[in-house]
Amino acid sequence: MGIRELITFRISGRGVWGYEFYDEARQKIGSVSSSVSPSLPVRIESQNIHWYSRFEMDTTIIPGIGRRVHDNQTGNEVFRLIYWRPGLYQVRSNSQPVQVEVKEGRYLFGQQGMPATALSERIPDIGWQPASSFEYEAYFKTTFYEKVNEVFALMVLSFPALRFY
């Protein structure tokens, strides 16, 4: 099997586009990332992408304020960012609940008191069709991790997953 193009589109938002490579046993075998801007078309090519993909963006924390991200070529809403508010959140169905609270004016979550960033809300019907041989998995995976020597956490939001068949 040769190299095949998975998807090409323009994204509204600035940040780092990243995607990870997995083998058939879902073992990670590599990853690539690059800076993106609203004017930059994002093109992903590989013969061994099993799960797809990840978008990373530093953001100012404004709890309760949402941001919508659109595919600039089609106008479809790709995902919506919803910033944390105090309360209990289930980030994924199999995850531990995350308590978000306010301390000294800052929104914090988790046992380490990490600053709260954002959670993603799946846009269920964006009218986007994956390339042939790929199946659209209608969910998002949200991951959080802390940047080294930085005040705020880095928000990591995945795009809709594609499973290779």
Residue positions per predicted region:
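Short, well-structured hydrophobic secondary-structure segments
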Residues: L40-D71
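Low-complexity or membrane-interfacial segments used for flexible interactions
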Residues: M1-P41, Q47-N48, Y52, N76-E77, ...
